[in-house]
Amino acid sequence: MKLPVILSFLLLAAGLSADKKEKGFKSVFNGKDFDGWAGPVDNYQIVEGAIQCKKGKGGTIYTKEIYANFVVRFEFKLPPGGNNGLAIRYPGKGDTAYHGMCELQVLDSEHPRYAKLDKRQYHGSAYGMAAAKRGHLKKAGEWNEQEVTVKGSTIRVVLNGTEILNADLSKVKEFMGGKPHPGMNRKEGHFGFAGHSDPVSFRNIRIKKLK
């Protein structure tokens, strides 16, 4: 078989494999505006096809659609010391860390300002409940890839190809500061981003519903 034919076959196979991996996923952000999103969208902006929290602003923006069990894939970029969060099964009001199922941390964990945090506050952790493994974030200013799977009471986080969290929140009995999380048993809710004044960016956001 000639080399060009082999290369064409390999490229076709790679394309089919990629399509299979994305089967069932639906884009929830069009890269142009906040169509399909709710919450304080004026505190966010679109920068080069990505959702970005405005510096000094924040609040939780979320999909208008509600999800129970799902997988979300996206890319994110942190500025130095950047802080944001993923709203999981968010009810549409209140602090998602407590009133949603959880807030998954999006944090520049290695920045000096975060040297003394509780281990349940670093990137990928279910805030105040379950700690993620550290050491798999790219440098601030670079794009990371992340996948989050939410099924029943379990949450799995894969960062840049490495599993950093696999937790069953129904088994969590000790909470940071002893503060309970009344929303942790929620069965459904919105997906969103919980901004904390830093220009953290998100793009290529796709969600697949699970049974």
Predicted regions: what is each one?
Residues 9-17:
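Hydrophobic h-region of N-terminal signal peptides that target proteins for export
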Residues 17-211:
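Carbohydrate-interacting regions of secretory-pathway proteins
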